[in-house]
């Protein structure tokens, strides 16, 4: 596989063992609908998980707004090595919470939220332009039903580490930010390991927990219609923002409000 093919496959996503479409549809009609009707538990803890091409500081516009509401906020430093290691890092933070917790994921970390979100401390889930696979779902096959996102052409590898080029980061990842701000974020971009792409999800926490989703209508990293499909499938309370992939930075007020809604 050449670099471009691998890059495209990456952004379309890799996960879990394939299961039948009928099984997915039946399960989604069942427990996902039930989860959406669960009452939202009052939570004072918020755990934020960043995606690829970023680090925990990507939540810097949201964190102070949540703290101003008296919430206890933790931003997980995702190791970006393997999915199990990333999930373990998230679980360790969840273990430290003293009660109901809203778990929030951006982009690729929707995989982490979906897997770790079954933790007993998690009261609700928030997906910000994020992947939301079903348990055992072939995310690649699902994503291939939608147009290939433009950012896929900008993923490059140095050995087993991948990252976005400066041009792709500014144009396709953070396209609605001032160039200076986008370049500052590019400077702290964390590389990811190829092994991260082979991870398999075994849980679908959105089947069990109330879920919320922020669709980015101008997203060039995950197709917006794929985001809409995943949000609808989990019967999430959904908002749409005229935003690039990084709505947590370009639309922090709206993202904060969605998290507060999930917190009850």
PLM feature spans:
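N-terminal export signals
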Residues: 5-26
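Post-His helix in hydrolase/transferase enzymes
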Residues: 249-261
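Gly/Ala-rich beta-loop-alpha elbow adjacent to hydrolase catalytic centers
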Residues: 105, 109, 113
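Conserved HGGG/HGGXW glycine-rich cap/lid loop of the alpha/beta-hydrolase fold
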Residues: 43-83
């Amino acid at each position: 596989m050449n670099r471009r093919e691998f890059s495209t496959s990456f952004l379309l996503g890799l996960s879990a063992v394939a299961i039948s479409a009928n099984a997915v549809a039946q399960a989604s009609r069942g427990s996902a609908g039930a989860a959406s009707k669960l009452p939202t538990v009052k939570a004072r803890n918020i755990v934020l998980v960043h995606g690829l091409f970023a680090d925990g500081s990507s939540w810097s516009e949201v964190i102070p707004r949540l703290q101003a509401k008296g919430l206890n906020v933790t931003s997980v430093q995702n190791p970006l090595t393997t999915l199990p290691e990333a999930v373990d890092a998230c679980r360790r933070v969840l273990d430290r919470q003293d009660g109901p917790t809203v778990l929030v994921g951006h982009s690729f970390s929707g995989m982490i939220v979906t897997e770790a979100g079954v933790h007993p401390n998690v009261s609700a889930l928030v997906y910000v332009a994020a992947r939301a696979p079903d348990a055992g779902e072939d995310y690649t096959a699902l994503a291939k039903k939608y147009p290939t996102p433009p950012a896929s052409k900008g993923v490059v590898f140095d050995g087993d580490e991948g990252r976005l080029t400066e041009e792709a980061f500014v144009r396709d990842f953070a396209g609605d930010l001032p160039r200076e701000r986008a370049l500052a974020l590019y400077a702290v971009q964390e590389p990811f390991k190829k092994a991260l792409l082979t991870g398999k999800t075994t849980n679908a926490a959105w089947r069990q927990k109330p879920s919320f989703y922020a669709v980015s209508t101008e997203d060039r990293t995950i197709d917006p219609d794929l985001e809409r499909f995943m949000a609808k499938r989990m019967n999430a309370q959904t908002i749409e923002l005229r935003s690039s992939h990084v709505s947590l930075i370009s639309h922090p007020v709206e993202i904060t409000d969605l998290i507060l809604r999930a917190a009850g």
